[in-house]
Structures are given as C-alpha cells and as structure tokens.
Amino acid sequence: MTGFLTCWDGSEYQLPQLYEWRLCYGLGSPCDSFEVCALWDGVRADLLAQFTRFRGVWKDQTVFTGVVDECESCRDGNGTRLMIRGRGMAALLLDNEAVGADYQVATLDDILRDHVTPYGITVGERGTFPAVSPFSVDTGSSEWQVVE
C-alpha cells in the first residue's frame, strides 16, 4: 500500500514505503480507523504537525481516506520509524457540533447537504429513505447524532 498525507494547506506528501498498515472498518461503530508505519529519515519533521488527512492507495485504488489524529516518530537501533494513526472521515461528524435547526420536512438530501457534505464527506451509495416530518436538530448534538 502507498500512503499519502495531506497538509492543512492542501499540499500532499507521499509517505516512504509502508512496512505495516492496519485498516479497521467499523461494521456498526461510527468510525473506521487506520494505523500505518514507515521507515523514515526524519527529514521534514516540521510537517508532522501539519498533516490533517491520510489516503491509502492499493493497486491504483484509494482504499481508505481519513483524518490524521496522531503522528509519532521513534528512533532506536533499527532506525527511525514514523507511525500515523487516525480515523475515517466520519470522525468529522463525531467531532463537530451541529447547529440547531427545525425542518418542517427533512429529506435525506437535506440532511446530507446540511450536516455531511460541508465536511468534505461524499456519499457513494445510499439507500432510499422517506422524508421525516417534523425533524429537529438539537443545539449541541454532534453531526453524527443528526445522521444517526
């Protein structure tokens, strides 16, 4: 797998060859997670605090996209290693507070438009859901709670 990290300014950095990776898909929990490890020369350590997104690519296909929660470098007798940990894009829904709102009628499109896509999350396949009337979003609830 090839790993790419994106900084807050949109610049992208390709990780050195990964020697270990773990992708966990939630299967019912609200958030997927990842952990990747690479040998690292320590150059550009100043970038570590600027990474916000991770993208894992396998055979030219993106297999994971997520939010970087933690970057750690460790040096020992075997060299310097870089470990990146984080969560899937749903983490943005868990971490952000929804603005309170009352909908007379809320469709799936309304909910996705107002509470999911503003965080850069795109929805691939989706089912059909009937409109909900009325629908209220409580101030202080997470965006995940709105979608759930």
List the model feature ranges, each with a label.
Residues 78-81, 85-148:
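Charged- and aromatic-enriched interaction segments used to assemble
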Residues 1-102:
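Assembly/oligomerization scaffold segments
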